[in-house]
Amino acid sequence: MEGMIRIKLYRSPICTPDKQKRVVKGLGLRKVNQIVERPDTPVFRGMVKKIPHLLMVVE
């Protein structure tokens, strides 16, 4: 879809700071290997940049 990004949680947020866990929850991710589609806006891009060690942008 145009204007959407697919985000995959490929590492568990266990043993990460609470702030990072809240970012994962804010993106709507709950399980490892779960993929969600979100609008390609600066808000969601910024959330992905905060925790690149946990997330992957899937094309």
Curated annotation (Swiss-Prot):
One Pfam family cited in the UniProt record for this chain: Ribosomal_L30
GO MF annotations in UniProt: structural constituent of ribosome
A single BP term in Gene Ontology: translation
Ribosomal protein recorded as keyword: yes
Keyword field: Ribonucleoprotein, Ribosomal protein
GO cellular component: cytosolic large ribosomal subunit
Stored InterPro entries: Ribo_uL30_ferredoxin-like_sf, Ribosomal_uL30_bac-type, Ribosomal_uL30_ferredoxin-like
Keyword Lipid metabolism found: no
SUPFAM superfamilies linked: Ribosomal protein L30p/L7e
Family: Belongs to the universal ribosomal protein uL30 family.
Record-linked NCBIfam families: rpmD_bact
Oligomeric form and interacting partners: Part of the 50S ribosomal subunit.
Protein name: Large ribosomal subunit protein uL30
Organism: Solibacter usitatus (strain Ellin6076)
Gene this protein is translated from: rpmD
